[in-house]
Amino acid sequence: MKDLHNREIKSLRISITPQCNLNCFYCHKEGHNIDNNKLMTPTEIGEMVKYSLKYGINKIKISGGEPLLRNDLPEIIRNIKNLKNNQIKDISLTTNGILLEKYAQKLKDAGLDRVNVSLDTLDPELYKKITGGNVELVKRGIEKAVEAGLKPIKINFVVMSNTVGGLNDIMDYCRKMGVILQIIEFMPVDEKLKKYHYDINKIEEEISKKSDKTMVRKFMQNRKKYLVDGLEIEFVRPMDNTEFCSHCTRIRLTYDGLLKPCLLRDDNLVDVLTPLRNGEDINKCFIKCIDRRELYFKE
């Protein structure tokens, strides 16, 4: 199905919990304050995905909070994988990696295809300062994900004024591990954080000079990919980027069952969990969400 601006809807991003085991100072805390009565069950998540298939969804991204805090995550993945008439080509997970060592093989066995791991620095002290966590746990989790056969594995590196100095180390690490590096523009959630913003155009300019090959991901906001000495690098720009909006093919579902037409807005959400629990037809909820998508983000 296409929205009113002729963009096909291909991807559903599901936040399954707002809880997290880290405390990153820049986090936008996707989702809402937790209410266990509203938390979607594995069965309900499966039902949501089943309905979404009618509208062309063929990719599922599971996120949080930290999704690995839900012990029933393998069940959630199996429920999605085992849907009848399943056209899902890709089930992926975004995680901070702290618990990945424990769950990587279980997730692969349940049907997970690939994983994105957040890693802003390899420096133990800086990592602890940014997140409050232990970077060695993340590295062990990435190793287990590689061993389990989850692929491609992508490392989400958020560029900030205090992390950009470690870019070369991150590149070397990703090359050694055989994983993809995503260089992500930092989105300040308030005025106090603007000092951490770093212009990634400078980085891309340098990377492009070293690149052996350049590609464009047409259905992912026309993102450019570079191949540098065997390392694949992508740039992700959510800020002031018309391509990010005009090529957006994704809708989002919060942990408490609200459909989000836009990543950056919370004023046009559609409640889909209440109608589902009341035994109502939720097709109209998906249609309403898709119809509320605008061509560009407006504040």
Curated annotation (Swiss-Prot):
Name the residues that bind S-adenosyl-L-methionine: Y26, G65, S118
Q: Which GO terms describe its molecular function?
A: 4 iron, 4 sulfur cluster binding; cyclic pyranopterin monophosphate synthase activity; GTP 3',8'-cyclase activity; GTP binding; metal ion binding; S-adenosyl-L-methionine binding
Question: What are the recorded Gene Ontology BP terms?
Answer: Mo-molybdopterin cofactor biosynthetic process
Which cofactor(s) are needed, names only? Answer: [4Fe-4S] cluster
Q: Where does [4Fe-4S] cluster 2 bind?
A: C245, C248, C262
Q: In which pathway does it act?
A: Cofactor biosynthesis; molybdopterin biosynthesis
Reaction catalysed by this enzyme: GTP + AH2 + S-adenosyl-L-methionine = (8S)-3',8-cyclo-7,8-dihydroguanosine 5'-triphosphate + 5'-deoxyadenosine + L-methionine + A + H(+)
**Keyword Oxidoreductase: yes or no?**
no
Q: Explain how, and how many, cofactor molecules are bound.
A: Binds 2 [4Fe-4S] clusters. Binds 1 [4Fe-4S] cluster coordinated with 3 cysteines and an exchangeable S-adenosyl-L-methionine and 1 [4Fe-4S] cluster coordinated with 3 cysteines and the GTP-derived substrate.
Residues binding [4Fe-4S] cluster 1, per UniProt: C20, C24, C27
What's the Enzyme Commission number for this chain? 4.1.99.22
Q: What CDD domains does the record point to?
A: Radical_SAM
Instruction: Specify the superkingdom.
Output: Archaea
Q: Which NCBIfam families match?
A: moaA_archaeal, PRK00164.2-1
What PANTHER family does the entry give?
MOLYBDENUM COFACTOR BIOSYNTHESIS PROTEIN 1 (PTHR22960:SF0), MOLYBDOPTERIN COFACTOR SYNTHESIS PROTEIN A (PTHR22960)
Its annotated function is as follows: Catalyzes the cyclization of GTP to (8S)-3',8-cyclo-7,8-dihydroguanosine 5'-triphosphate.
The record ties this protein, via HAMAP family, to: MoaA_A
Its family remark reads: Belongs to the radical SAM superfamily. MoaA family.
User: What protein is this chain from?
Assistant: Probable GTP 3',8-cyclase
